[in-house]
Amino acid sequence: MDLRLVLVASPILLAVGWAGFNIGRAAVGQLQLMLKRARG
């Protein structure tokens, strides 16, 4: 594997992972809210 490729790919992977983590966390929060409302 080329070092330049790693240098280019790592920040992209980090950004994608961070975005996915935030989206997942928000989705879990929404699901919990929906469940609370459904139980009411």
Curated annotation (Swiss-Prot):
GO molecular function, one term: manganese ion binding
Record-level GO BP terms: photosynthesis
Top-rank taxon, per record: Bacteria
Subcellular location: Cellular thylakoid membrane
Record keywords, A-Z: Membrane, Photosynthesis, Photosystem II, Thylakoid, Transmembrane, Transmembrane helix
Bilayer topology annotation: Single-pass membrane protein
Similarity comment text for this entry: Belongs to the PsbY family.
Subunit structure of this chain's protein: PSII is composed of 1 copy each of membrane proteins PsbA, PsbB, PsbC, PsbD, PsbE, PsbF, PsbH, PsbI, PsbJ, PsbK, PsbL, PsbM, PsbT, PsbX, PsbY, PsbZ, Psb30/Ycf12, peripheral proteins PsbO, CyanoQ (PsbQ), PsbU, PsbV and a large number of cofactors. It forms dimeric complexes.
Described purpose of this protein according to its UniProt entry: Loosely associated component of the core of photosystem II (PSII), it is not always seen in crystals. PSII is a light-driven water plastoquinone oxidoreductase, using light energy to abstract electrons from H(2)O, generating a proton gradient subsequently used for ATP formation.
Protein name, entry field: Photosystem II reaction center protein Y
Protein species of origin: Synechococcus sp. (strain RCC307)
